[in-house]
Amino acid sequence: MKIFFAVLVILVLFSMLIWTAYGTPYPVNCKTDRDCVMCGLGISCKNGYCQSCTR
């Protein structure tokens, strides 16, 4: 059980790393620049979407 949990944690961490490095496959809606914090620092909200977070 511990091995399964460790593998699961590693998969989650790698998926989060890939998400932040390459953006998301779907547009991230936002109202202000603060809504785009999950995409990284300095990402701006334009036309209701986080620009650099969307592929």
Swiss-Prot record:
Q: Where in the cell is it found?
A: Secreted
Q: Which GO terms describe its cellular component?
A: extracellular region
Could you tell me which SUPFAM superfamilies the record lists for this protein? Scorpion toxin-like (SSF57095)
What domain of life does the native source organism fall in?
Eukaryota
UniProt keywords, alphabetically: Disulfide bond, Secreted, Signal
Matching InterPro entries, A to Z?
A: Scorpion_toxin-like_sf
Cysteine pairs forming cystine bridges in this chain are: 30-45, 36-50, 39-53
Reported tissue expression: Expressed by the venom gland.
Endpoints of the signal sequence: 1-23
Extra remark beyond the main annotation: Negative results: does not show any effect on Na(+), Ca(2+) currents, nor on voltage-gated and calcium-activated potassium channels.
Recorded protein name is: Neurotoxin X-29S
